[in-house]
Amino acid sequence: MKTSPHRNTSAIVDLKAIRNNIEKFKKHINPNAEIWPAVKADAYGHGSVEVSKAVSDLVGGFCVSNLDEAIELRNHLVTKPILVLSGIVPEDVDIAAALNISLTAPSLEWLKLVVQEEAELSDLKIHIGVDSGMGRIGIRDVEEANQMIELADKYAINFEGIFTHFATADMADETKFKNQQARFNKIMAGLSRQPKFIHSTNTAAALWHKEQVQAIERLGISMYGLNPSGKTLELPFEIEPALSLVSELTHIKKIAAGETVGYGATYETSEETWIGTVPIGYADGWTRQMQGFKVLVDGKFCEIVGRVCMDQMMIKLDKSYPLGTKVTLIGRDKANEITTTDVADWRGTINYEVLCLLSDRIKRIYK
C-alpha cells in the first residue's frame, strides 16, 4: 500500500515533541544508561526512518521488531546500533551480521540452528532473551543461558547482551513485576560471564520503577507522548503527544428528519440535520467502533453518525461549514482536545493499538 499524497487526511508528527520527551526521560532515568528507542511498527505509526534520524544524536541505539525493519533503517543511512527484539529465521543471520544488526537469541535450539549455517559468525551480535514471566520468547533458566554463552564463544559469536521484558510494569499492583524482577536477577547472578548490555527497562519500568539500574533503557510509547498505563497511573513528569490526526470536510448537506445515514441505516435523524463527510475510514485504521464517538470541527465536538465506511465517515454538524474545513480526530482544536487514549477507551483497547493501526494511506507530515 502506498501513501495517498493527494488525499486530505494527514497525521501530523511533531519531531521536536519526541526529542523533548526523550530529553525529559534522560533527566529522570539512570544517567549512565543509554536510551534505545523502540521504533518498531513504523515507530508506532509515527515513521521509523524520520523519527530515528530526528533523535539519533540523543540515543545509543534503536530497537525494532524484525529484520526487515532494521534493514529499512540501514538502507536510509541510520548508523546507530540496532537490536531486533523478535526472533528471526536462522538462515538470515548473515544479513544481520553484515549490516551490524544485533539479534535476539530466544533459545539454545535457535542458536544451534544458527551455528549450522554456512555463514561468517564472527560479526554476529546476540542478546539472549529471558522469559521471566511474559510467556512470549526467551530462555527460562540459567543453565540454558550458560550453554548458549558457551556455544556463542565456540563460534566467535559476540554475546553482546541479555534482556527480559516486564508484563505488568504499568500496573498499580507490583507483585508480578517484582516476581519477574527476581527471576531475571537470579539468572543474571548465575551467568558464567556478563555481557556488555543487561537490560529489562521498558517505558513503564523507566517511569515507575527507577530502582532498575540498566545499561539500556528501551523507551517506547512515552517517547511519543503517551502514558503506557492509559489513565491507570499518573506520569511522574509531563510529556507531549507527538501525533495529531486531521482531515477535512469533503461534502456537506442538510437532510430531513427521518432520513438515515450509512450502511445498515443505523442512524436516523430526528430533525433537519447538517451532515458532513470526512475522508477517513476503517481501511485507514479508523475502525467501525468509532460510530458514536466525537471529532472536533471549529473547536466543537461533533458526533460520528452511521457506520464508519471503508474510506469515509459521516459526522453531525451544528451548522453548514465550507468545504475544506478542518476536522480533528486526534489532537487539540481551540479549547477542546481528543487524545489517543480517549479513542482507545472508546474502542476498549490501548493507545498503542490506535497509533499502530493508522495505515500507510494516511500521509505523515513532519514538523
UniProtKB/Swiss-Prot annotation:
List of catalytic residues: 40 (proton acceptor), 263 (proton acceptor)
Sites of N6-(pyridoxal phosphate)lysine modification: 40
Catalytic activity: L-alanine = D-alanine
EC number assigned by the record: 5.1.1.1
PROSITE patterns linked to this entry: ALANINE_RACEMASE
Residues engaged in binding substrate: 136, 310
Biological process, per Gene Ontology: D-alanine biosynthetic process; peptidoglycan biosynthetic process
Pathway membership, UniProt: Amino-acid biosynthesis; D-alanine biosynthesis; D-alanine from L-alanine: step 1/1
The entry's keywords: Isomerase, Pyridoxal phosphate
Record-linked Gene3D superfamilies: Alanine racemase, Lyase, Ornithine Decarboxylase, Chain A, domain 1
GO cellular component terms listed in the entry, alphabetical order: cytosol
GO MF term (any one): pyridoxal phosphate binding
InterPro entries named in the record: Ala_racemase (IPR000821), Ala_racemase/Decarboxylase_C (IPR009006), Ala_racemase_C (IPR011079), Ala_racemase_N (IPR001608), Ala_racemase_pyridoxalP-BS (IPR020622), PLP-binding_barrel (IPR029066)
Cofactors: pyridoxal 5'-phosphate
Function: Catalyzes the interconversion of L-alanine and D-alanine. May also act on other amino acids.
HAMAP family: Ala_racemase (MF_01201)
UniProt cross-references to PANTHER family, sorted A to Z: ALANINE RACEMASE, ALANINE RACEMASE, CATABOLIC-RELATED
Family membership: Belongs to the alanine racemase family.
Official protein name in the record: Alanine racemase
Gene encoding the protein: alr
